[in-house]
């Protein structure tokens, strides 16, 4: 069959009409240098601060320096095979991480990818790692407690839901142990937990995960890991990623607790990135915005009011407040709390738990220094019975610390001073607590009642710990109803005082101490 010229022209015209040109505009640039995880890119226009840049091999970098002719970006992951001249693409997206209940019980990296070998994670969507903190109008005052199960903290340095309480001290002194005990104590309280491990050894993180699993708290916890072997960018971003995962619960009218272990290592990672980006160094070679690094993170831990939750959930959740409580950890060098990063974080947070190495070495664990530890907002949230009975504990310890120094020089002490010294020694012994053995409100109250009402006065100092263990066992067996009432209501009145007094008198009559 032969076609004439008219038919050929018609066919060509039809083909041209049907031809669909898909134009794709790409924002592309070229790598001009690669230095220790920092890449400099030319030709990349219209890039946002913090934008994800797609690299060869399904990797991403984050734009941090936006200069007139080039972009400085930090690579999130391995960078050894990146080379000058390779093409990169702008994505127009800010870094997001998966959020939702599916993350509970899982161990993930900074990007929210599972690293525990338990398969993919079902998420409820994605959330940007950098989010503006709730405003003043959206917040509610802190008035509900977070029970850590550690009697020295619950009695003297109470923590409320939505508070930021710093844990500060030298290395290997029990900072992480306090945070872990607090997480383990939340397994039946409805508070979800997030543990962010920054710059730690993989073996240390494995031990943490194992401990949480053994004590039944892993199913209620998200573990975010940026280990010491990972890129500085991932260590810098890990706390923000963990915070976004915690905000998922806060914004839906639930309560969450997040532990940053530790922010000193995050500051070091950020210092490394900043120096490689040639930003001007300041005090201790940290960049000028290292305060903002931590303030914008810790301000996201807050108690939000009912209106905020209702607006966020489009009316699905009504009459509920949400909270995100933060326990940031800072490591000091030889007890120097006046260094740059420690002073910054102390000024940002609502109080600090200061751990001292000489207390730790003398067997007082947790090694909390009651004199300079403080909770600025937690007092309003403290359980009534703990508040009433714990008031004299801090005073007894303060007086003991003052008198102990004086007693070293004076041999003949009057009876009142000697009684005060011995009471202080017994209270110090009473504040000791083993790791992974959090106490209920009632158990803490019973211990404080024994100290406050003089039931320890005739107990030998080296028997105080045994006395307390036996007392708790007796109360849970013989006074189960009273303990349940205290745990449920947390009230303190004359009836409860009389019941506790009778119970302790009966207990002390069973054996001599």
UniProtKB/Swiss-Prot annotation:
E.C. code: 7.1.2.2
One Pfam family linked to the record: ATP-synt_ab_N
Signal peptide from the UniProt entry: none
Superkingdom of origin: Bacteria
A Gene Ontology cellular-component term: proton-transporting ATP synthase complex
Membrane topology: Peripheral membrane protein
Xref: Gene3D superfamilies: 2.40.30.20, ATP synthase alpha/beta chain, C-terminal domain, P-loop containing nucleotide triphosphate hydrolases
Sorted UniProt keywords: ATP synthesis, ATP-binding, Cell inner membrane, Cell membrane, CF(1), Hydrogen ion transport, Ion transport, Membrane, Nucleotide-binding, Translocase, Transport
CDD domains: ATP-synt_F1_alpha_C, ATP-synt_F1_alpha_N, F1-ATPase_alpha_CD
Xref: InterPro entries: ATP_synth_asu-like_sf (IPR023366), ATP_synth_asu_C (IPR000793), ATP_synth_asu_C_sf (IPR038376), ATP_synth_F1_a_nt-bd_dom (IPR033732), ATP_synth_F1_asu (IPR005294), ATPase_a/bsu_AS (IPR020003), ATPase_F1/V1/A1_a/bsu_N (IPR004100), ATPase_F1/V1/A1_a/bsu_N_sf (IPR036121)
Localisation per UniProt entry: Cell inner membrane
Gene Ontology molecular function: any one: proton-transporting ATP synthase activity, rotational mechanism
Binding site for ATP: 169-176
Site (Required for activity): 373
NCBIfam families noted in UniProt: atpA, PRK13343.1
Family: Belongs to the ATPase alpha/beta chains family.
Name of the protein described by the UniProt record: ATP synthase subunit alpha
Native organism: Colwellia psychrerythraea (strain 34H / ATCC BAA-681) (Vibrio psychroerythus)
UniProt gene name: atpA
């Amino acid at each position: 069959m032969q076609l004439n010229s008219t038919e050929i022209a018609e066919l060509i015209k039809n083909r041209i009409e049907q031809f669909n040109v898909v134009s794709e505009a790409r924002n592309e640039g070229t790598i001009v240098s690669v230095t220790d995880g920092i890449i400099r890119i030319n030709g990349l226009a219209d890039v946002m601060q913090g934008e994800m840049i797609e690299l060869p091999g399904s990797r991403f970098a984050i734009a941090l320096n936006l200069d007139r002719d080039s972009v400085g970006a930090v690579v999130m992951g391995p960078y050894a095979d990146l080379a000058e001249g390779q093409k990169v693409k702008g994505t127009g997206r800010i870094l997001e991480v998966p959020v939702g209940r599916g993350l509970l019980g899982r161990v993930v990296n900074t990007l929210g990818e599972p690293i525990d070998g338990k398969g993919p994670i079902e998420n409820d969507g994605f959330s940007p790692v950098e989010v503006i903190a709730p405003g003043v109008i959206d917040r509610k005052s802190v008035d509900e407690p977070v029970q850590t199960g550690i009697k020295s903290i619950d009695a003297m340095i109470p923590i409320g839901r939505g508070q930021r309480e710093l844990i500060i001290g030298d290395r290997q002194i029990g900072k992480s142990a306090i945070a872990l005990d607090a997480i383990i104590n939340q397994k039946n309280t409805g508070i979800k937990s997030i543990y962010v491990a920054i710059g730690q050894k993989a073996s240390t993180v494995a031990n943490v995960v194992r401990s949480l699993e053994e004590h039944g708290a892993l199913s209620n916890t998200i573990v975010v890991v940026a280990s010491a072997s990972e890129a500085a960018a991932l260590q810098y971003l890990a706390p923000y990623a963990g915070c976004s995962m915690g905000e998922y619960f806060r914004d839906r009218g639930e309560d969450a607790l997040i532990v940053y272990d530790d922010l000193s290592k995050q500051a070091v990672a950020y210092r490394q990135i900043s120096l490689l980006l040639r930003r001007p160094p300041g005090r201790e070679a940290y960049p000028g915005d290292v305060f903002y690094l931590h303030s914008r993170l810790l301000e996201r831990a807050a108690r939000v009011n009912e209106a905020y939750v209702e607006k966020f959930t489009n009316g699905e959740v009504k009459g509920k407040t949400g909270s995100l409580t933060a326990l940031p950890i800072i490591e000091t060098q030889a007890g120097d709390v006046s260094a740059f990063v420690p002073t910054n974080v102390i000024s940002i947070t609502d109080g600090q738990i200061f751990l001292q190495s000489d207390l730790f070495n003398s067997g007082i664990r947790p090694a909390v220094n009651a004199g300079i530890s403080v909770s600025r907002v937690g007092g309003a949230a403290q359980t009534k019975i703990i508040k009433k009975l714990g008031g004299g504990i801090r005073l007894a310890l303060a007086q003991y610390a003052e008198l102990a120094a004086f007693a070293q020089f004076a041999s003949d002490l009057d009876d009142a001073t000697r009684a005060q010294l011995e009471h202080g020694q017994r209270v110090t012994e009473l504040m000791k607590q083993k790791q992974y053995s959090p106490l209920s409100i009632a158990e803490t109250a019973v211990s404080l009642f024994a100290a406050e009402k003089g039931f320890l006065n005739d107990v030998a100092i080296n028997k105080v710990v045994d006395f307390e263990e036996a007392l708790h066992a007796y109360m849970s067996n013989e006074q189960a109803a009273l303990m349940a009432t205290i745990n449920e209501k947390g009230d303190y009145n004359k009836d409860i005082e009389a019941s506790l007094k009778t119970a302790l008198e009966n207990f002390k009559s069973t054996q001599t101490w």
